[in-house]
Regions:
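Polytopic endomembrane small-metabolite transporters, centered on the Drug/Metabolite Transporter
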Residues: 1-356
Length: 356
């Protein structure tokens, strides 16, 4: 009987994890955009999100809710400097991107994450992509240019520039994460803890240096101009709380998602998320979705879905080709140890075309 219930439980677990990621990702974009429309302090907003996530990590650790106890080691911090630096820059650029473009255009502005990631793996890891992978990247790139240059409504080129820069940093970050996991002995939980904590600390001098202090003071003690009965401070606080909590929960759920989801489920959820984000942008913020913008999003999703399918096929082929060496190992004619899928492929399969 337990064996009969196991497949049903597994299906429910997959549905639960995928649904959570879908809802959380959409809520993050909408909440971020709502706050960024009302504030001139995007870096302080990012700091508040990370600070709330850190508090939740500490509370969960105190209540023994995490599988591992949280630690703090200076040598570990030093080893994570490259990743934390890229994380801070990438998240900051993502917020600036969302502040300058419509929510429905955000996915297009950051549409070059996948092509940049493939190029980064070629440059830094010397991993040559297959022809089909190059074709998938070409589709995504074409979708980006359709949205930027062939749409009837011209987007903010400042926002597009931030989006391209953010995509490049995200791509390099996905390469660096492999070495960073080794620093924390392969623990995704510890990596998330250190990343949130150190990123929050690093952001403090940054938002001071870029001149956000006057905006922060105005937000905290200035005159309140109510918008639909809600003040900018209330919007900021609620937005920080919602996105901070969701960011923490997504960090925890990522431990589970790697185990229970497949590239195919990711492909489907990414497509649904892309369409839903556009619809929410139109509904919540009155975004204009032209035929050019819709075509751009569709092409990017098609290229991303094709990439995910190709990576799945290539991993399956690699698994089949390993059967012969494994057989020879059983016969005593040699040894073979099957290698796990590269962390980079897992990260790319999970994120697709990031927006944090």
């Amino acid at each position: 009987m337990p064996h009969q219930n196991e497949p049903k439980s597994s299906r429910l677990l997959v549905i639960g994890v995928v649904s959570f990621y879908l809802v959380a990702a959409l809520a993050m974009v909408v909440a971020n955009k709502k706050v960024l429309n009302e504030t001139t302090t995007p870096l302080f907003f990012l700091f508040c999100q990370l600070f709330i996530a850190v508090i939740l990590f500490l509370a969960s650790d105190a209540l023994r809710l995490l599988p591992d106890r949280l630690t703090f080691d200076i040598n570990t911090c030093k080893g994570l400097v490259p990743m934390v630096s890229l994380n801070v820059v990438g998240l900051s650029l993502s917020n600036y991107t969302l502040a300058h473009v419509d929510a429905s255009f955000y996915q297009v502005a950051r549409g070059l994450v996948l092509p940049f990631t493939v190029v980064a793996t070629l440059v830094f890891l010397h991993s040559t992509p297959s022809v089909r992978i190059i074709l998938a990247c070409s589709l995504v790139t074409a979708g980006f240019f359709v949205g930027v240059f062939l749409d009837g409504v011209r987007p903010s080129m400042v926002g597009v520039a931030f989006g391209v820069a953010s995509s490049l940093i995200t791509a390099i970050h996905s390469v660096v994460i492999k070495k960073s996991l080794a620093v924390v002995n392969g623990s995704a939980l510890m990596l998330s803890w250190y990343t949130n904590l150190l990123s929050a600390i690093v952001l403090i001098p940054i938002f001071i240096l870029v001149g956000e202090v006057p905006g922060i003071m105005k937000l905290l003690v200035g005159e309140f101009t109510a918008v639909d009965g809600t003040s900018p401070l209330q919007i900021f606080l609620w937005g920080s709380l919602i996105t901070g909590c969701l960011g923490f929960l997504m960090s925890i759920a990522s431990l589970l998602s790697i185990k229970v989801t497949s590239p195919i489920t990711h492909m489907i959820s990414s497509a649904v998320r892309g369409v839903a984000a556009s619809m929410l942008g139109k509904w919540c913020f009155g975004d204009i979705i032209t035929s050019g913008r819709a075509s751009s999003i569709g092409i990017i999703l098609l290229g991303s879905a094709y990439y995910t399918w190709v990576k799945h096929q290539e991993s399956q082929s690699g698994a089949k080709s390993s059967e012969a060496p494994q057989a020879s190992s059983r016969d005593g004619r040699g040894s073979y140890e099957r290698v796990k899928m590269d962390e980079l492929d897992l990260e790319a399969a999970r994120k697709g075309t990031k927006p944090e």
